[in-house]
């Protein structure tokens, strides 16, 4: 939910609009995913879509090791964040986001929120903290698996300029995150289901919390 629905579909792609209280909830969920501040996540993901499977892709398995694609790209110093910010589009996007008090709050307090939440869970019951840590590890692996395997093996519904594929296992177990070729073909589309078996749970969640007129 934090990475898939919040950071990815809502903040990075703006696939749906939602109510202000839910927007703040999504901000906290994205932060608790611990993959980096929302601003960093959005900028690197935009770079991924603009330069997918090129030497400038932040985490293409075509040019990077599996360890880098799964793990190391999440550290700003590991994927040359300054190079992103030298790009005019990325720099403009970063400036726009940092002018918004919402993004500025989560950017400035990213690690404080994670540490405070973890401490509260541990004080209530260490088992709660362990559950959070386990959920984080599972979601982290899911993201890495999509970044790696959905650019190497699977089937394609659309002929895109990159090597993206759909992966049945990651699509089903990843709540729709594995329909990667569908997503790269239509990055602004909320529901990624193109064939009947491509169940997109994250897309359905996004639809449920979409702001109604």
Model-derived regions, located:
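Flexible secondary-structure boundary motifs
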Residues: 149-155
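Non-catalytic, topology-defining segments of multipass membrane proteins
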Residues: 1-145, 149, 179, 189-213
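Active-site-proximal inter-transmembrane loops
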Residues: 92-101, 156-179, 184-186
């Amino acid at each position: 939910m934090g990475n898939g629905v919040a950071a990815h579909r809502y903040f990075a792609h703006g696939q749906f609009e939602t109510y202000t209280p839910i927007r703040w909830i999504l901000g906290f969920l994205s932060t608790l995913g611990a993959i980096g501040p929302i601003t960093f996540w959005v900028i690197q993901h935009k770079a991924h879509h603009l330069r997918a499977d090129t030497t400038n892709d932040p985490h293409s398995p075509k040019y990077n090791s599996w360890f880098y694609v799964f793990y190391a790209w999440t550290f700003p110093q590991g994927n040359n964040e300054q190079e992103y910010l030298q790009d005019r589009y990325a720099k403009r996007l970063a400036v726009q986001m940092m002018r918004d008090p919402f993004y500025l709050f989560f950017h400035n307090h990213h690690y404080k929120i994670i540490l405070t939440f973890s401490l509260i869970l541990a004080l209530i019951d260490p088992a709660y903290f362990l559950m959070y840590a386990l959920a984080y590890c599972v979601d982290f692996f899911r993201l890495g698996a999509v970044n790696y395997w959905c650019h190497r093996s699977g089937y394609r519904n659309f002929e895109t300029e990159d090597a993206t594929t759909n992966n049945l296992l990651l699509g089903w177990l990843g709540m729709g995150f594995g329909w990667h070729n569908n997503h790269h073909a239509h990055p602004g589309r909320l529901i990624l289901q193109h064939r009947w078996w491509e169940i997109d749970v994250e897309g359905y969640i996004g639809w449920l919390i979409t702001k109604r007129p």
